[in-house]
């Protein structure tokens, strides 16, 4: 049985014999090689440890960097927020001043006034002295004409003519020259004072000049 095994699988004796036959120098050469291999094995272990350490450091850096960035970003945002809040009132003050200046009422421009007491003029002549019968066309008599385009204050052709006649009559009656003539005639008919003099007014002054006084009077309208 052993012979069959030896035939099939071989024996270890030839290998032992070869090991014995090998020279001593070869064994010496192999021993340093084995030692170097043995010495290199720890280095490989150290390299693997370094690699594992490096991998651990990489993991720590990757996980820690976002938190640091987030913390720095939040700190920067907090610093910028007060600056923006402090700058906001300065920006809001300027529009208030502008709005205050815009709301100030501007002084109204003085418009030229109209003298309502002055009589209107037409062709260099007071309008009250014009006779409506002297107009040839008389446009206010045309069919469809608006009387208010030619007469104001409810006047028409006939009431306007009556008003003008009355105004001319009043002005004629209150003419200063006519008034002085009438007053002179009335004074001439009065009896003379004793001593041929006029009665002095209080204060020793005579009667003022009636002509000047009448000139200062405005005729009624």
UniProtKB/Swiss-Prot annotation:
Keyword Nucleus attributed = yes
Basic and acidic residues bias: where?
A: 14-23, 93-105
* Biased segments, Low complexity type: 60-92
Record field: compositional bias (Acidic residues): 42-59
- Give UniProt keywords alphabetically: mRNA processing, Nucleus
The record's InterPro entries line, in alphabetical order, gives: Fip1_dom, Pre-mRNA_3'-end_processing_reg
Q: Write down a Pfam family by its short name.
A: Fip1
* Main location, first listed in the record: nucleus
- GO cellular component terms given for this protein: nucleus
Q: Does the keyword Translocase apply?
A: no
**Where is this chain's protein located in or outside the cell?**
Nucleus
Tell me the segments the record calls region Disordered: 1-114
One Gene Ontology term from the biological process aspect of the record: mRNA processing
Tell me which PANTHER family the record gives.
FIP1-LIKE 1 PROTEIN (PTHR13484), PRE-MRNA 3'-END-PROCESSING FACTOR FIP1 (PTHR13484:SF0)
Q: Which family does it belong to?
A: Belongs to the FIP1 family.
- Summary of the function given for this chain in its UniProt record: Pre-mRNA polyadenylation factor that directly interacts with poly(A) polymerase.
Q: What is this protein called?
A: Pre-mRNA polyadenylation factor FIP1
User: Which gene does this sequence derive from?
Assistant: FIP1
């Amino acid at each position: 049985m052993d012979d069959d095994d030896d035939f099939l699988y071989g024996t270890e004796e030839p290998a032992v014999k070869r090991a014995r036959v090998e020279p001593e120098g070869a064994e010496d050469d192999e021993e340093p090689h084995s030692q170097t291999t043995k010495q290199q094995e720890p280095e490989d272990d150290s390299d693997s440890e370094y690699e594992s350490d490096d991998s651990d450091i990489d993991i720590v850096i990757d996980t820690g960097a976002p938190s640091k960035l987030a913390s720095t970003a939040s700190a920067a945002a907090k610093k910028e927020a007060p600056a923006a809040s402090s700058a906001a009132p300065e920006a809001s003050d300027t529009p208030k001043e502008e709005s205050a200046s815009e709301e100030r009422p501007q002084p109204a421009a003085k418009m030229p006034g109209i003298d309502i007491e002055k009589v209107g003029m037409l062709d260099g002549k007071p309008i009250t002295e014009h006779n409506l019968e002297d107009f040839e066309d008389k446009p206010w008599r045309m069919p469809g004409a608006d009387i208010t385009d030619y007469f104001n204050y409810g006047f028409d052709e006939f009431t306007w003519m009556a008003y003008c006649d009355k105004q001319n009559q009043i002005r004629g009656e209150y003419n200063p020259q006519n008034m002085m003539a009438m007053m002179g005639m009335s004074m001439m008919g009065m009896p003379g004072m004793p001593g041929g003099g006029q009665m002095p007014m209080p204060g020793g002054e005579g009667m003022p000049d009636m002509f000047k006084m009448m000139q200062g009077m405005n005729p009624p309208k």
